[in-house]
Structure formats: structure tokens, C-alpha cells
Amino acid sequence: MKPIVAGVAGTVLLAGAIFVGTIVSDKISVDSNVGEQEATVQTQLPTTAAAQSVVYAPPSIEEVPDGPMKEAILYGYELVNNTHVAADEYVGNQLSCTSCHAGAGYDEQTSSLVGVMANYPQYIGRSGSIVTIEERINGCMVRSMNGKKFEMNSDELEAMVAYFAYISEGVPIGAKREWAGTSDMKNVPIPNVADGEELYAQSCIACHAADGSGTDANTGPALWGENSFNDGAGMARMSKMAGYIQNNMPIGTAGTLTDQEASDLAAFILSQDRPEWANHDKDWPKGGRPNDIMDKEKREQIKNGTIDWEKVLSTN
């Protein structure tokens, strides 16, 4: 049975929203060169010793204090760590949030979600609007999870937000999360797909399987095929995939791949068939659509040898 968290979570989140709104309304600037060309709203906080000394120190999921929020936080953790099972009616593949955000977002080195509440609301160029943390979660649900959105008042969504709020304790709104960084590769070299295929066979199949179908959602997720992310997900971009591979793979020896090797691997993985995003035409409504989104057209160009890699990588 799903826990009933809406009333409790809503009360706490409302208080948080009032706090966030007070700060955000003070001063907001938009940087159009952030991340995957998804301009980010950055809240400008006073320069204080506390704001400058934010460290990675999330509270333990093993020590969630007793109280009205405990059930919601623990349910949120389960949803993040085991998404395709805990929220199976919403997920269209065999991935979990942990597939990319290791340790349910706790891992300091792998796309950490610790302190994520400090970065929302945020302007996302892909949607052409300012989005809340709830909207960002739902964006992942329909793209990375190839599924459907949670209802805005659902137990699932409110539990996930409660969990993110918990692991964001001590991180002020607008603070720079040094541990989060960005997985983008800024200058992706022209890839060699054949070399990427060879490298995949040598180094990746033990966890991700020869056919890319994966062996476990959290330790060896599907990289292509029907159980992977669709081509509207951020990871379907060359700059994102190559950067993620170089920063995090192979497990145990992350950071050892060259730019060229990471690019080769990314190109091979993204050349494979995967679910198609139905709303490419609605993305980037205000312009700035990057060229390195590896959609069906580009996958076919790779297969028939007509892809113009210089053009694809020209925005990175």
C-alpha cells in the first residue's frame, strides 16, 4: 500500500516554497550558457561565510528522524532507488533514478542529487519556461523513464520531493554545489563508431550486456533498446553521454578514458535503436536547440554513413 503523504508533505513543502519564494523574488538572473544550453535561473544570495562554505554532508537515510515526514522521506528514497518497481505504473522501461544518480542521488561523484532543492525553480531552455522541482521530476519520468507524469498531488511526487528536501538539508537556496558539477563534455571529438563498438565489447558488456539490454537497473542499466531512455532524454545528447561516460565509467576506474574513447563509446551507444520521443517539435520553443540530440534521423544517418559529425557537434 502506498503511504498517505499528501497532507503532511504539502504542509512542509508550502513552508519551503514560501522561504524559496522570498529569496527568489529578491533577485533572479538568467544565464543562457548553463548546462545543455538549458538556461538556468540562478538565485543571488548575499555573500556570506556560510554561503561560501557549503560542504557535502547529507543526513543519512538510516537516521531519518521520527515525525510526520519520515514515512514520506523513506517512500521517496524507495521511489528514487527502485523507480521501475516502486512506480511501475508510471515507468515505461527498466530504469531507476539511480541508473544515473548513483546511490539514490547520495553518491558524491556520480550526478549527485544532494542539495538539488537549492537549484529550483530553474529556467530550462528545452521547455522554454521556469520549472519547479516537481516539473523537473516529471520531465525525467517522460524522457529518461520513457513513461508518464505523476499527478501533481500524488503521493509519489510529494514523497520524492520530501526525499530531495531531506538530502538537501543544510544547502541554502542558490548555493553552488561544488560536488554536483556538470557531466557535459565541452569539446567532443569526432567519434569513430566502430572503435566505440570494439571498446564497448571489451569494457562494458559485463554490466550492460552485449545487446545493451543491461543486467541490473542500478548497477548495469539498459543503454539502448526498449528498456532504456528515449531520445528526448538529456542522455541522448552526445555531449551529455560522452561526459557521463568519461566522468563515471568504467566503475572503479572512472576518469581513465580519453575524450576520444568516451566520444567513440557515446556514438556507438547512441547509434543503437531506442524509444522515440514524440515531442521533439515542441522542445526548445524559444530557439537554441542543440545539434547533438541523437534522434532517429541521426541514428539512421550513422547506419548509412551520411552523418555530418562536425555539424552534430558544432554547438558543444
Residues covered by each model-derived region:
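Short helix/strand-bridging catalytic loops that position acidic/His residues to coordinate divalent metals
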Residues: 181-188, 220-232
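Short sequence/structural segments immediately N-terminal
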Residues: 30-37, 90-95, 106-107
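Sequence/structural segment immediately N-terminal to covalent heme-attachment motifs in c-type
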Residues: 68-104, 188-220, 224, 238-239
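Post-cleavage N-terminal segment of exported redox proteins
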Residues: 1-77, 83, 122-193, 302-316
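Surface-exposed patches in mature extracellular/periplasmic domains of secreted proteins
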Residues: 85-92, 148-153, 174-177, 253-259, ...
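Extracytoplasmic electron-transfer domains, predominantly the class I c-type cytochrome c fold
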Residues: 70-75, 79, 107-150, 160, ...
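A cross-kingdom marker for long, charged
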Residues: 276-316
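Secretory-pathway/luminal and periplasmic proteins that interact with or process carbohydrate-rich
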Residues: 86-88, 104-110, 167-172, 272-279
